[in-house]
Amino acid sequence: MKLIASNKKAYFDYEILETLEAGLALLGSEVKALRQTRVNLKDNFVKIIKGEAFLFGVHISYLDTIHAYYKPNERRERKLLLHKKQLLKWQIEASKERLSIVGLKLYFNQRNKAKIQIALVKGKKLHDKRQSLKEKALNKEILADLKHHFKG
């Protein structure tokens, strides 16, 4: 698995409940751009429209070598390739519990197919974000103390 891009902000802003791997319907020039890691997953989300899942907000820059006539929209919606049962299950869960679906990681699998790991998430409140920052700082301090204790 070759990691192309990761959405680190999603881990901070959301509580991740369930993850799933999905394929992407891409153009040839977009696949070439992915191989050069010219992608940004920062503010992406998944919307289910008429029984199909679409990924919005992913920015895939086109290559400099592309012809001026053929320049696809860098932020266009991209279709996700999922099984119908998985899609229906997630659609019901997301609408029932007011959850969101976001992309976490974009990568090439062993067969060189572009895949995205999507997650069913619940938004964190401000105090939850502060709590996770405190826990992170505390863990960092504990690790530093342990390292210092065993080193000297």
From Swiss-Prot:
Keywords: Cytoplasm, RNA-binding. Its main location: cytoplasm. GO terms for cellular component: cytosol. One of its GO terms (molecular function) is RNA binding. CDD domains: SmpB. It holds the Pfam family SmpB. InterPro entries: SmpB, SsrA-bd_prot, SsrA-bd_prot_CS. It is found in: Cytoplasm. Coiled coil: none annotated. One of its GO terms (biological process) is trans-translation. SUPFAM superfamilies: Small protein B (SmpB). Gene3D superfamilies: 2.40.280.10. Belongs to the SmpB family. Required for rescue of stalled ribosomes mediated by trans-translation. Binds to transfer-messenger RNA (tmRNA), required for stable association of tmRNA with ribosomes. tmRNA and SmpB together mimic tRNA shape, replacing the anticodon stem-loop with SmpB. tmRNA is encoded by the ssrA gene; the 2 termini fold to resemble tRNA(Ala) and it encodes a 'tag peptide', a short internal open reading frame. During trans-translation Ala-aminoacylated tmRNA acts like a tRNA, entering the A-site of stalled ribosomes, displacing the stalled mRNA. PANTHER family: SSRA-BINDING PROTEIN (PTHR30308:SF2), TMRNA-BINDING COMPONENT OF TRANS-TRANSLATION TAGGING COMPLEX (PTHR30308). NCBIfam families: PRK05422.1 (NF003843), smpB (TIGR00086). This is SsrA-binding protein. It comes from Helicobacter pylori (strain Shi470). The gene is smpB.
